[in-house]
Amino acid sequence: MKIDTLYQPKLSASGKVTVAVCFAFLGNAAVAANIEAIGQTSVQQQHNVDIVNIAAPTAQGLSHNQYNKYNVSQHGAVLNNALSAGKSQLAGNLSANKNFQGQTASVILNEVVSKNPSLILGQQEIFGIAADYVLANPNGITHNGGSILNANRASLIVGTPTVSDG
């Protein structure tokens, strides 16, 4: 018995159009909603880069941010940990994080609470004061070509974090 190692399905013209349309919609969906925050955390875009105004930290310095989706495109994402305006490496001029009350985060916990896995394709930057970075997603994390700027330490965790005394 001979097994072909290269399988090439034969599609009709309408089948090829259908496949092309499906891929077009999938591509637009991935670009349209990279990061969807819940609660105090907010997201906007500047120069195609997602800017995340992280939640105000606790007295111990933990900024606990929850998301329905946490994906980073090739354009990147910036986590705003700044008390004053300045220049981001990825997004240019940014203002201070409006959620802060005089204290920056020492640990930025990014927790995905939905059924969506995370796809990290680009750089992430902690703008302002350097902090520890944690991405926790029990549904999985694919990291392909991404990096993290201005982080003291970084952890990608496939699981659900437990926070105590945070």
Where would I find each of the regions flagged by the language model?
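Solvent-exposed adhesion/ligand-recognition segments of exported proteins
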Residues: K2-K16, V21-G166
